From Swiss-Prot:
Function: Kinase required for the regulation of cell division and differentiation. Is part of a signal transduction pathway, activating PleD by phosphorylation.
One Pfam family hit: HisKA
Compartment(s) where it occurs, according to its Swiss-Prot or TrEMBL record: Cell membrane
Record-given protein name: Histidine protein kinase DivJ
Species of origin: Caulobacter vibrioides (strain ATCC 19089 / CIP 103742 / CB 15) (Caulobacter crescentus)
Predominant location category: membrane
GO biological process terms held by the UniProt record: cell differentiation; cell division; phosphorelay signal transduction system
KW Membrane (keyword) present: yes
Residue ranges annotated for the Histidine kinase domain, each copy included: 335-553
SUPFAM superfamilies (UniProt xref): ATPase domain of HSP90 chaperone/DNA topoisomerase II/histidine kinase (SSF55874), Homodimeric domain of signal transducing histidine kinase (SSF47384)
Region Disordered, residue ranges: 561-597
Keyword Hydrolase: no
Length: 597
C-alpha cells in the first residue's frame, strides 16, 4: 500500500541525507551530457556549412562568413565556460541571443535563411532544464527576432543569400536549433526520470523502515478513515479491521466516543493522545498518539502498553502499601514508646530511692546494682525518647512548642547533663558562648535535644584525651550552633548516609554505641525550624557539625566579658560553661561538606 501524498512528502524530507542504496544520485545514471554534445554538434555543423559555402557558386561575401562566426561564438564560449552559476548562465544566454539575432540580420533578417537562429537562446535554455532559464531564453529570442525584423524593414540588413547557399544556411539553422530543442527535451526527461527514480527509492526505503517499526503507524483522513497502515499491529488490532472499519471501529464500544473526540481534537489543536481497549482484545490497553500533517489528514502511532500499565498499577499499589506500612510502623513505635516509658519511669524512680537509701542502709553490692539499674534505665529512656520523637516526626504528629528564650540557657543545660559523661570518657568539653543574650523564638526542648545529640555523638567517637567544643553565636537573624570534636572522623562513603534514620557510620563496634537516630533527629528538628544541618569531616581529623536556625530575634546584646566559671557538679545551680576562644572554623582544605536532604 502506497503512503498518502502528504505523508510521503513529509517523511521523504527525513531521507534527503540517506546514503545508497536508498538514494541513487542522478550522476550515476547520467551518461554523455546532451548539452555538451549539442554545443559540439553546433560547432561541427557551422564548420561543415562554411566548407559547403566554399564550393557554392556564390559564397555570399563577408556577411555570410560574419553570420557563421556570430553563430559559432556562443557555442565555443559555452564549451569554455562550463560553470553552472546563475550569473554565468544568464550571460551565456545573452551571448546566444546576440549571436543568433546577428546571424539572422546578416543573412536577410527574419525572412532570411538563418532566421531560425533567433531561437538559439531558447534551445540553449532548454538544455539547462530550468523553467526560469527557459523563460529568460524565450524573452531574449523575442527581442532578437524583433531586432532582426526591424533591421529588415528599415532596409539596413544585407541582401539574403540565394540559391544553394541559402539552402545550406537555412538547413544549418533549422538542424542546429532543432537539435538544441531536442537535446533540452532529452535532458529534461532524463533528469525527471532520475528524480522519479530517487523519489521511488526513498518511498521504498520509507515503506521498508515503517514496515519494520515495533509499533503500528497509520494515516487517518477525516473522522477516522484509515488510508495507510505500516508496522507491527498491537495485540487486539488488525490491519484489515483498521482499513475496513476505521480507527473508531477498532476500539471497544465503550471507548469509541473518547476516540472520536480525540480525532476531532487532533484536527483542531494539531495533536492528541489517549489510551483505549481494542475491540478484539478488551483485556489489552493500546496507546494512540496522533498529529496533524495536513488539513483533514492525521498520522498516528498505535502501541501496546498493557505490560507498562500493569507495571504502573503494581508500582502504585506497592507505593500505597509502603506508605501504609510506614505510617503503621510510625504509629506502632509512637504507641509502644509511650507505653514503655510508663513502667520505665517507675523503675527509674525506685532505683533513685534505692540509691538514696531512703529505707535504710544497703550493702555496697546492692548499691552498685541500684546504680547500674539507674544508668541502664536512663540509657533506655534516652533511646525511647529518640524513637518516640522520630516516630512522631515521621507520622507528622510532632508539633513545635515555640517560645522566646535565651538560647545560651538551653546550650548550658545540655552541657551540664553531659559533663559527667565527658569526665568519664576523659574528653575535655568546652563551651564558647557570647557574653550577650541570644534571644530566639524556637522550641526550647528541641534546641536542647539538638545540643544533647550532637555533643553525645561527639563524646562517643572522641578518644580519651580528645576535645569537644560547643560554639553558639548569631548573625543576620540566624542562630548557629557548632559542635566540633577531635575524634576519629567520618569517611566520604559514610557521609552520604548520615542524617537518615537508623543510619550509622564507622565499623560494627562504633555502630553498637547508638541507634542511628541522633543526627536524624537533629536534622529533623532543624528542618522543622526552617534551618539546616551541615556536616564537615575528614577521616582521622575530627568532625564539625553546624546547625543553622533562622530563629534569632535580635542582635546579640553586648556585655562586659566575665572570667570563665569553673564547672560544678550536675546537682549544683546552673553555672555558665567555660568560655574559650573558638576553634578554627575549618578542618583544612580537604574538608568534606555535606548537607542532608
Amino acid at each position: 500500500m502506497i503512503l498518502p501524498t502528504a505523508l510521503k512528502s513529509r517523511l521523504a524530507l527525513e531521507f534527503e541525507t540517506l546514503p545508497d542504496p536508498f538514494r541513487r544520485p542522478a550522476a550515476r545514471a547520467a551518461g554523455l551530457d546532451p548539452a555538451h554534445a549539442w554545443r559540439l554538434g553546433w560547432l561541427a555543423a557551422v564548420c561543415l556549412a562554411a566548407a559547403a559555402a566554399l564550393f557554392t557558386a556564390d559564397s555570399g561575401g563577408w556577411p555570410v562568413w560574419a553570420a557563421l562566426g556570430a553563430g559559432a561564438l556562443p557555442a565555443l564560449v559555452s564549451l569554455i565556460f562550463t560553470r553552472e552559476d546563475e550569473r554565468t548562465q544568464s550571460w551565456l544566454l545573452v551571448l546566444w541571443a546576440v549571436g543568433g539575432s546577428l546571424a539572422a540580420v546578416l543573412t536577410g533578417g527574419v525572412g532570411g535563411a538563418m532566421a531560425a537562429w533567433c531561437l538559439a537562446p531558447v534551445a540553449a535554455a532548454s538544455t539547462q532544464d530550468q523553467p526560469k532559464r527557459l523563460a529568460e531564453g524565450a524573452a531574449l529570442a523575442l527581442i532578437g527576432a524583433c531586432v532582426a525584423a526591424l533591421t529588415q524593414l528599415s532596409g539596413l540588413a544585407p541582401a539574403a543569400p540565394t540559391g544553394p547557399l541559402a539552402f545550406v544556411l537555412g538547413f544549418l539553422a533549422l538542424v542546429t536549433t532543432g537539435l538544441g530543442l531536442a537535446a533540452g527535451l532529452l535532458i529534461g526527461r532524463r533528469r525527471q526520470g532520475a528524480r522519479d527514480d530517487r523519489y521511488a527509492s526513498e518511498i521504498i526505503g520509507l515503506e521498508t523502515l515503517l514496515d519494520g517499526l515495533p509499533h503500528l503507524a497509520i494515516a487517518v483522513r477525516g473522522q477516522g478513515q484509515v488510508t495507510a497502515v505500516r508496522g507491527a499491529a498491537p495485540p487486539g488490532v488488525t490491519r484489515a479491521d483498521l482499513v475496513n472499519r476505521g480507527l473508531t471501529g477498532a476500539a471497544a464500544p465503550g471507548d469509541r466516543q473518547r476516540l472520536t473526540a480525540a480525532i476531532a481534537q487532533a484536527h483542531r489543536e494539531g495533536s492528541a493522545s489517549l489510551t483505549f481497549n481494542p475491540a478484539l482484545g478488551v483485556e489489552r490497553v493500546v496507546a494512540l498518539d496522533m498529529h496533524r500533517v495536513a488539513p483533514n489528514q492525521l498520522v498516528g502511532v498505535l502501541r501496546d502498553i498493557t505490560v507498562e500499565r500493569h507495571r504502573e498499577h503494581a508500582l502504585d499499589q506497592a507505593r500505597i502499601d509502603a506508605e501504609a506500612l510506614a505510617a503503621g510502623r510510625a504509629r506502632f513505635l509512637a504507641n509502644m514508646s509511650h507505653e514503655l516509658r510508663t513502667p520505665l519511669n517507675a523503675i527509674m524512680g525506685f532505683s533513685d530511692i534505692m540509691r538514696a537509701r531512703m529505707f535504710g542502709p544497703l550493702s555496697d553490692r546492692y548499691a552498685e546494682y541500684a546504680e547500674l539499674i539507674h544508668e541502664s534505665g536512663g540509657h533506655l529512656l534516652d533511646l525511647i525518647n529518640d524513637v518516640l520523637d522520630m516516630s512522631k516526626i515521621e507520622a507528622e504528629r510532632f508539633e513545635l512548642q515555640r517560645g522566646v528564650f535565651d538560647a545560651r540557657e538551653a546550650v548550658q543545660a545540655a552541657m551540664r547533663l553531659l559533663r559527667v559523661q565527658s569526665d568519664t570518657a576523659g574528653v575535655q568539653l568546652r563551651g564558647v558562648l557570647p557574653p550577650g543574650e541570644l534571644e530566639v523564638d524556637a522550641d526550647r526542648r528541641a534546641l536542647k535535644q539538638i545540643v544533647l545529640n550532637l555533643v553525645s555523638n561527639a563524646l562517643k567517637f572522641t578518644p580519651r584525651g580528645g576535645q569537644v567544643t560547643v560554639t553558639a553565636h548569631g548573625y543576620d537573624g540566624v542562630l548557629e550552633i557548632v559542635v566540633a570534636d577531635t575524634g576519629v572522623g567520618i569517611s566520604p562513603e559514610d557521609l552520604e548516609r548520615l542524617g537518615r534514620p537508623y543510619e550509622q557510620a564507622g565499623g560494627a563496634e562504633q555502630r553498637a554505641r547508638g541507634t542511628g537516630l541522633g543526627l536524624s533527629l537533629v536534622r529533623a528538628f532543624a528542618q522543622l525550624h526552617g534551618g539546616e544541618m551541615v556536616i564537615e569531616s575528614r577521616l582521622g581529623a575530627g568532625t564539625t557539625v553546624s546547625v543553622r536556625l533562622p530563629v534569632l530575634l535580635a542582635p546579640m546584646v553586648a556585655a562586659t566579658p566575665t572570667p570563665p566559671a569553673a564547672p560544678e557538679a550536675p546537682s549544683a545551680p546552673e553555672p555558665a560553661p567555660t568560655v574559650e576562644e573558638p576553634p578554627p572554623a575549618s578542618l583544612g582544605d580537604n574538608v568534606i561538606a555535606f548537607a542532608p536532604r
